[in-house]
Amino acid sequence: SFIQFDSGQYLVDQGAMTKLYDFEFSMIGDPLVDIATMGMRNSYEPLGAPLPELVRYYEEATGEPVNHDAVVFHVLQFSLLGTMQFTGTVGKPCPGDPHSVYLMFDLALRRSILLALSHLTGDALPELRPLEQRTGDNAPLLAKLVDTLGTLPVTGEAAETHKAQVAELIEWVQRADDHGADMVARNIADVSALLGRGFERWIDAAEALEAYILKAGPEEDAALIAVLATIEGRRLQLFGPTALGEAARHVVLPATRFD
């Protein structure tokens, strides 16, 4: 079937859909991909009718039942592909990139990966203790930066949007200043416990964890999912409360059938 792949993007006028757009990823593939990506988008851009109702219409039109676990698999696949697509510029930003947008996508897609993995494997995501309230050492300097940006005169919608993106990045940095060092220390401790050796720097721990995962057998999946979910869960705790984290806070698996 011809699929849009990044589906669910419609132009609507007075309650009627007028156009589809964003077809650069379109291809021949499994039509359940479009149901999966429509469902992902539905969490923050509602489609209108409940998704289970739309799925029922699809089943009536095709005469075939939808494989609901296959939909979740495609959620996992799309989320993983998207994360890999942005990981380069998130880790090493390119001049002129929409940095705040990519951070938002990265955080939300990683959350989607974890939810899909948990559903498909049956491994529950770990419960994390709440972050303690604290203020980072650079709080006064960052407050000055926020104040300076707020008084910066700008003219035009494009300039206002750019200014808002800078404010979002500053808020992200503030959260990293408040809790980032503690998060890294906890992540290093978890990886050290799993691998049985200590690390001084997170980059060394992350590289060792990646090498371990590449060699691990399926019997270690549950333990690895728990570690990765803990690491990414802490990241969501850290940046979820920001403006850029709003999409990640609303990520849920597509509900493709009525309970």
Please annotate each region the language model reported.
Residues S1-V33:
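Active-site acidic catalytic loop and adjacent metal/ATP-binding pocket
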Residues H119-K144:
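Charged, amphipathic alpha-helical linkers/stalks
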Residues D97-Y102, P126-L131, P153-V154:
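Short beta-alpha connecting loops at secondary-structure transitions
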